Amino acid sequence: MALVKAKPTSPGRRFVVTVRNKELHAGAPYEPLVEKKTRKGGRNNTGRITTRHRGGGHKQRYRVIDFRRDKDGVPGQVERLEYDPNRSANIALVLYRDGERRYIIAPRGVSAGTEIVSGVDAPIKPGNALPLRNIPVGTQVHCVELRPGKGAQLARSAGANAQLVAREGRYATVRLRSGEMRQVLAECKATVGEVGNSEHALRSLGKAGAKRHKGIRPTVRGVAMNPVDHPHGGGEGRTSGGRHPVSPWGVPTKGHKTRSNKRTDKFIVRRRKR
């Protein structure tokens, strides 16, 4: 895996930096694990925009990922690594001994031919999934569940990891990349190691069109809008907005806390760093 800087043969190529991974499968995905994906353009069922800056982009198909890792005790072998347009991490196609194939998030250090397994007796090596109560304290993990059997929810993107820092009674404490320390039920599963493709953060799309290919539309500044559209809008000539930065709905955007889920506050041991 290497970063490749494009030659400036045109203005659109001048700033392009891509990640080249020769281990990735060049062909089509495994068809039984591919589903149709309908684009919503950021709209909900009433047709109103609920997520801004979405729309257009290349047609994509969804790869069904095994986030539960519930095939306990059945060894599997990684057949190949693949690109997934739906996430920053790469995915691995695993062939299990009973003949079933599943996609998993590709951990760092896992390649074609690597043996993986899940379950309480799984060895502590990258790619193996087991409950937090069976993982040694200090181990780096990813794809961490928040509820047993629900499937991985934490540390799933490229280069992500969490560290198991303590275990007491029914709960284990994990430290996330954000600095947040959180208690999770020790029965929840996690995968050993960190997510691969960490170079994803270093790439540069190089031009606006590449963003559009991904289905991301432009972000318009509030000061460039009219007063009816944004609190920073309007004024004669160019203005600074005239107030502290806020969202289109008047919520402060710099340093203002917006977390409102009080029900799970008790599980957060330490807040994330600002």
Curated annotation (Swiss-Prot):
Ranges of compositional bias, category Basic residues: 50-59
Region of interest (Disordered), ranges: 38-59, 223-274
Record keyword rRNA processing present: no
Record GO terms (molecular function): rRNA binding; structural constituent of ribosome; transferase activity
One cellular component (GO) term of this entry: large ribosomal subunit
Annotated InterPro entries: NA-bd_OB-fold, Rib_uL2_dom2, Ribosomal_uL2, Ribosomal_uL2_bac/org-type, Ribosomal_uL2_C, Ribosomal_uL2_CS, Ribosomal_uL2_dom3, Ribosomal_uL2_RNA-bd_dom
Keyword Nucleus: no
An annotated GO BP: cytoplasmic translation
UniProt keyword list: Ribonucleoprotein, Ribosomal protein, RNA-binding, rRNA-binding
HAMAP family hit by this protein: Ribosomal_uL2_B (MF_01320_B)
Known role: One of the primary rRNA binding proteins. Required for association of the 30S and 50S subunits to form the 70S ribosome, for tRNA binding and peptide bond formation. It has been suggested to have peptidyltransferase activity; this is somewhat controversial. Makes several contacts with the 16S rRNA in the 70S ribosome.
Family per similarity comment: Belongs to the universal ribosomal protein uL2 family.
Quaternary state and interactors: Part of the 50S ribosomal subunit. Forms a bridge to the 30S subunit in the 70S ribosome.
Official protein name in the record: Large ribosomal subunit protein uL2
Gene symbol of the encoding locus: rplB
